[in-house]
Amino acid sequence: MLTVNTATAPADLGPGWRSGIDKRPSSEALSVRAPGPRQGGLGSGVVGDSICDPRHHGGDDQAVYAYAREDLDDWQSRLDREITNGVFGENITTSDVDVTNCLVGERWSIGSDGLMLEATSPRTPCKTFSTWLGIPGWIKTFTAGGVPGAYFRVITPGTMRAGDRIEVVDRPDHSVTIGMVFRALMLEPE
């Protein structure tokens, strides 16, 4: 894991529009726990992280969002602009882990104190993401790119910090990847 990223202060995207998308790398070990339901829960699974729109973000099935540095590098090249760790709103920026091709239900062990996460779904791009990046047509561009990153639920709470090892410890007996679900939802709904 390259970085663990949190939004400690909400980004102001316009009148009455605040978001937790402005995530920055942390040098600290951060606690991770199941946040409960979207409505009335704790929001993010990463303690200290901000979720400002619980109708669409956070909760047990979107407790932690991961994105691969290799995919950020590809976007950096395509967009000809710097893409820093956390700028896509990810809590975890990985290296040498294929996030898009992980299986729904795949379990990751992170660090050494028992933190266990399970892949649940891809990110679907939204107006907040587009406004944050300030790229015209970003929702269509991101969707066409086909590398959405993955949301995870917390199976076993623990801590994580930059440099922790991510180990795939269980892969379900099916072939449904995060990328496949993304394509089915966004590109090939029939």
Range-by-range predicted roles:
Residues G105, P157, R161-D164:
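Loop/turn positions that initiate beta-strands
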Residues E106-T156:
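Glycine-rich active-site loops that engage anionic ligands at enzyme catalytic sites
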Residues M1-G111, L115-T128, D170-E190:
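Electropositive, beta-rich accessory/interaction domains or terminal extensions
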Residues V147-P148, D164-I166:
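A structural signal for small-residue-enriched, beta-sheet-centric alpha/beta enzyme cores
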